[in-house]
Swiss-Prot record:
Biological source species: Mycosarcoma maydis
Pfam family, one: G-patch_2
Record field: compositional bias (Gly residues): 240-252
Keyword Nucleus in annotation: yes
GO biological process: mRNA splicing, via spliceosome
One MF term in the entry's GO annotations: nucleic acid binding
Name the record gives this protein: Pre-mRNA-splicing factor SPP2
Predominant place of localization: nucleus
Length: 417
């Protein structure tokens, strides 16, 4: 491909020129050949053509370092533009630490530590309890001349220290007084003219804020750090490594706990029942006392409507639905006539007792009228109970017995007359 590009570049153009000037063509070819940069193309990728000398992309994970010794109070003051105001005020800055300069960020001449001016909270040593002065112990072998010499040295040292401290206090007070007098127009202090605090406008504050902001990220920055890897890049800058758990010492959980939705209507401390199929496997040898469940097939027997005449005739409704092989054969019924007659006799006795009790109840209740009895007979005819009673052999025998009794009573009454 590189050879074809070279041949195409050296091939003379066949397009007609406007003025047919060969000198112009030669000059153009020389200029194009001198400005052309030949590069061998190896392959084409997502980002375009790739040459042979292209640097390989590093697969190392990205690390976002943490800014150390960051003073958020000083950063806020710089963004609001108060540093210049503090520098103009000088010694009138209130709430200033001893040994610190008026302008934050500028260390004093005596201090060599860079972090001495950082406004941190609770950095001073706290003093608690009673503080007792240690008295000097006098020994027996000390001579009076030595003791007197020591006392004289202490007195001279105290006398020399007091003027120095008073001079420092007087110097600070004098400097403050001079600054106040300079603000009223007296320039004898030598501190300059009147102190004017410059108040920045909104546009200046906005411009200062824009200048303090970092550069806007490009598309390459977003492509280099995916969204799901941004937090891990921050953790790597804080000292986290792959496979390290959370907490102190890296012994905590490695994966965050995922919240699980609680089942509906499930109280606190309750466990959800398994919703899968029940395990109906055979019991193990250890639990031999467990009996396996009966797995026989239960057939459904349909229930049909029964006729009340079957009950009156002494037949059960389920006898008609029984299969033929389960019904008793006629040969068995002929072999046992006595049992059949005994059942019939018992049934007749029950009906006779029921009729006597019903007649006795009607005779004992004088409040019943003929209209009520007629209604009951009408209901019986409508329900179809009277034909059953007439067709029943026990009811027929009762009527014959009552008619015979009536006939005997009439005969006896006729003989008496």
């Amino acid at each position: 491909m590189a050879g074809s590009l070279r041949d195409r570049a050296h091939k003379p153009s066949t397009r007609p020129r406007a003025f047919d000037d060969s000198d112009d063509d030669d000059a153009g070819l020389l200029a194009s050949s001198s400005s052309r940069h030949e590069e061998e193309i190896v392959s084409f990728g997502r980002d375009g053509a790739k040459g042979r000398g292209a640097s390989p992309v590093s697969d190392a994970p990205r690390v976002i370092p943490v800014t150390s010794n960051l003073d958020w109070r000083q950063d806020r003051k710089e963004r609001l533009g108060r540093a210049s105001n503090l520098q103009a005020l000088g010694p009138l800055v209130s709430m200033r630490r001893a040994g610190a300069s008026a302008v934050p960020g500028l260390a004093s001449s005596s201090s060599t530590n860079d972090d001495i001016n950082i406004d941190a909270i609770n950095t001073e040593a706290q003093k608690r309890g009673l503080k007792l002065r240690s008295s000097k112990v006098t020994r027996a072998d000390d001579t009076p001349q030595q003791l007197s010499g020591d006392v004289f040295d202490e007195q001279t040292a105290d006398a020399s220290a007091v003027p120095k401290a008073s001079a420092d206090v007087a110097g600070e007070d004098a400097e403050a007084i001079k600054a106040l007098l300079a603000g009223q127009g007296n320039d004898s202090a030598g501190t300059g003219g009147q102190l004017i605090i410059h108040q920045e406008t909104e546009s200046e504050l906005l411009q200062h804020d824009i200048d303090s902001r970092p550069e806007a990220p490009t598309l390459d920055d977003y492509a280099a750090t995916p969204i799901d890897q941004f937090g891990m890049a921050l953790l790597r800058g804080m000292g986290w490594k792959e496979g390290m758990g959370a907490g102190k010492g890296g012994k905590g959980p490695q994966q965050a706990a995922e919240p699980r939705k609680r089942a509906a209507l499930l109280g606190l401390g309750a466990k959800e029942r398994p919703t899968g199929p029940l395990n109906l496997s055979k019991p193990s040898s250890s639990s031999g006392n467990l009996q396996p469940k009966d797995k026989r097939d239960y057939k459904y027997v349909p229930v049909s409507k029964s006729d009340p005449r079957d009950y009156s005739n002494g037949r059960s409704p389920s006898s008609d639905h029984q299969p033929r092989e389960k019904r008793p054969s006629k040969s068995h019924s002929t072999d046992l006539p006595s049992s059949h007659d005994s059942r019939r006799g018992d049934r007749d006795d029950r009906h006779a007792r029921h009729s006597r009790t019903s007649h006795r109840q009607r005779s004992r209740s004088p409040t019943r009228s003929g209209v009520h009895d007629r209604d009951r007979r009408h209901e019986r005819r409508r329900d179809g109970r009277d034909p059953e009673r007439r067709s029943h052999p026990s009811s027929r025998s009762d009527r014959d017995r009552r008619s015979e009794c009536d006939r005997d009573e009439r005969r006896s009454s006729g003989h008496r007359r």
